[in-house]
Amino acid sequence: MNQTLEEVVSLARQCGCGHRHYDIPIEQMVVGREAFARLVAYLRHKRYERVAIVADDHTFAAVERSLCDQLENGSIRYTVCLVQPDENGDVIADERSIVQVLLETPDDVDVLIAVGAGTIHDITRFSSYKMRIPFISVPTAPSVDGFTSMGAPLIIRGVKKTIQAQAPIAVFAHTGVLCQSPKEMIAAGFGDMVAKYTSLADWQFAHWMADEPYCPFVHQLTEQSLQTCVDHIDDIAAGGEQGIRVLMDALLQSGIAMLLMGQSYSASGAEHHLSHYWEMEFLRQKKRQVLHGAKVGVSTPIIIEHYQRVFWPLLNELEKRPKSMDEATWERLKANTASIRELLESLPSPERIRTMLAKVGGAIAPEQLGIDPQLVERSLREAHRLRLNRFTMLYFLNELIFVE
């Protein structure tokens, strides 16, 4: 991170935005080759004698020798729950995976350890919350910014829902393990960071148009983590330890920013809603899943194109109020027109986003992910309904301007 955890907490206390800043429950956050040794020391300090590792076949294989040797040398007893994939070979954060973890975790376990990427963390986060025990994060790839999140995006009866659960009490990310993660997962992590361009724009817009809680400090933290990745794109693309550490630190800082606000506005906007919509459609069609970061990376330039194509004509024709919009909202839109123009102009071009994604080895078009143009168009009309309490420019356009 650009600041230490202690510095972030201190700066948050000095913030004058007027909104509540939540306590950060994370006691330690270690990114480096000493991570697993520090994990064992932390477990002993907390007097956790029995732990349960939650992983899948691939993530457990990535750490089995290095992590388990450390646990055994530290006299830490552990069990392992390997979450089983579905019929397509995907590990899904759904009811089946959660029930498996609940059934296989011994009653006397002190803490769960999530060993994996986003999906394993979501399963562990919710399961530990329901079991009323803490969990520790051990990322095996720098692929998402949700490691430190309280929210668990789950598939419940085929529908994507984000359920507030709990954040990890500590994070131990071994850079040696992270550097060995598949290139597509590193590209996905960069994609999740690139998505902050539109999520931050949506958040600012929601503050202006719907009085959503907004904090300049949290915005700055998120923007800073994004810019650091952009500035070090060559290092990240090279896949060396320096670049991977930069990416991991940025993902963690973005997650800490969400924790401070108690919600994910800073990191998740319309681009995430498109991604969730595509994910649900793939589940319905029983197609193999695509990495979350790959989807939001691809959806970000799509959202930018959509906003610039649709919003500019609207801002140029403010004489007549649409029948679907009340007078107060119309007046607010007119009052904020200059700011909205500036916001749209500040977004990078879709071509620049795609160039950056390609540089780190990521997909740049939905077709590369098996997403056809019809699904993209449908998601632009309907994806905002997955989270109607999240005010975005996409929500505004679909619900208040182009009402079907």
From Swiss-Prot:
Respond yes or no to whether keyword tRNA-binding is given for this record.
no
E.C. number: 1.1.1.261
Query: Which UniProt keywords are listed?
Result: Cytoplasm, Lipid biosynthesis, Lipid metabolism, Metal-binding, NAD, NADP, Nickel, Oxidoreductase, Phospholipid biosynthesis, Phospholipid metabolism
Where is it chiefly localized? cytoplasm
Compartments, as annotated in UniProt: Cytoplasm
Question: Which Gene Ontology molecular-function terms are recorded?
Answer: glycerol-1-phosphate dehydrogenase (NAD+) activity; glycerol-1-phosphate dehydrogenase (NADP+) activity; metal ion binding
Q: How is the cofactor bound?
A: Binds 1 nickel ion per subunit.
What protein am I looking at?
Answer: Glycerol-1-phosphate dehydrogenase [NAD(P)+]
Q: How does it assemble?
A: Homodimer.
Biological process according to GO: glycerophospholipid metabolic process; phospholipid biosynthetic process
**Which SUPFAM superfamilies does UniProt cross-reference here?**
Dehydroquinate synthase-like
The UniProt record gives the binding positions of Ni(2+) as 192, 272, 292
What HAMAP family does the record point to? Answer: G1P_dehydrogenase_B
* Recorded catalytic activity of this chain's protein: sn-glycerol 1-phosphate + NAD(+) = dihydroxyacetone phosphate + NADH + H(+); sn-glycerol 1-phosphate + NADP(+) = dihydroxyacetone phosphate + NADPH + H(+)
- Which residues are noted in the entry as substrate-binding? 145, 192, 276
Stored Gene3D superfamilies: 3.40.50.1970, Dehydroquinate synthase-like - alpha domain
Cofactor list = Ni(2+)
